[in-house]
Amino acid sequence: KIEIPAATPNGVRYALQTIKQLLPVAIYGETLSADENWSVPCTTINDAPRFGYRGMHLDVARHFFTLDEVKRILNVMAVHKLNTLHWHLTDDQGWRVEIKKYPRLTEVGSIRNKTMIRKEWDNYDTTPYGGFYTQDELRDMVKYAADLGITIIPEIDLPGHMMAALASYPELGCTGGPYEVSGQWGIRDDVLCVGKEKTFEFIENVLLEIIDIFPSKYIHIGGDECPKIRWEKCPACQARIQKLGLKDDEHGKAEHYLQSYTTERIEKFLNEHGREIIGWDEMLEGGLTTNA
C-alpha cells in the first residue's frame, strides 16, 4: 500500500505527482489500459518544496492563448508542482479581459490591425489579430486552476503599456490621441495620463472588476517601462506635480516621483479592498511603496 501523510490538500496533490513520476510515462496518457501491471519500489520519500512561490508567467497580450491552451499549461504546471500562474492580461498589443464598465476595452482594444514580423521594424503582416476572455470564462479558469492547487495572479500593466486602453478610450492619454492598438513590440511613449482624476477613476473601476474575478491575495499592476516624455509636456501631469510639490533631485526627476505617487495611490486602493500589489522592478523608480 501507499501512505501519504501531508499537512494540506496541496501536499497530497504534490505527493501524487511524485508517485506518478515513479511510473512509466504512459501514466500521463489520455487513456490507461486495464492490462497494465506497474509497480514501484518499496521506499520512503520525504519531500517538501524549497520555495513557497513556484510560478510561471503567461503573456496573452502579444500572443493570445485559447482557454484550452491555458488549461493545458495549467495541467503541465501541476505536473511540475508549480503553484502560481502570473497571467499578463493587458499590454500595448491587446486587452484580453472583459471589463463590463468599459466595453470598448474588448470591442476595440482586443484587436490589433497588424503585427510586426519577427524583429523587422518596417515589415508587418496585414491580418487583424486578437481575442479576449469573458468574466465567466475567467472565473471558470480560476476554479480550474484552484482544483490543481494553482493560484492565478492577474496583471493589469500600468501606467505604461496601455496603448490598447488608450485606443479604446483616448481621453485617458495626455495628448488625446489618436491612438491604436500597437502592432509593434517594444515600448511606446504614450501612457496613461496620471494628471487626470478620470484616469484614476478608470484604474479603480477596472481593478474592482478584476478583484471580483480573481480571489488572489496579490494583484500585479506592472509599473514597468513607463516613459515620462508625455508627462513632461502634459499640463495636467505638470499641474499635479506642482500640487504635490514633487521636484527633481539627485535620485530622480519629478516625473519619476509622479509614478511613485500613482503606485502608492493604487496600492492604498487595493489594500482597502484586502489585496496587495506586485510589480516589475521599475516600479521602484521614485521610491518603493509601503507594502509592495
Regions picked out by a protein language model, each given a short descriptive name:
Residues A165-T175, E180-A292:
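Active-site neighborhood of glycoside hydrolase catalytic domains
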Residues K1-E201, N205-Y218, R265:
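Feature activates predominantly on carbohydrate-active enzymes
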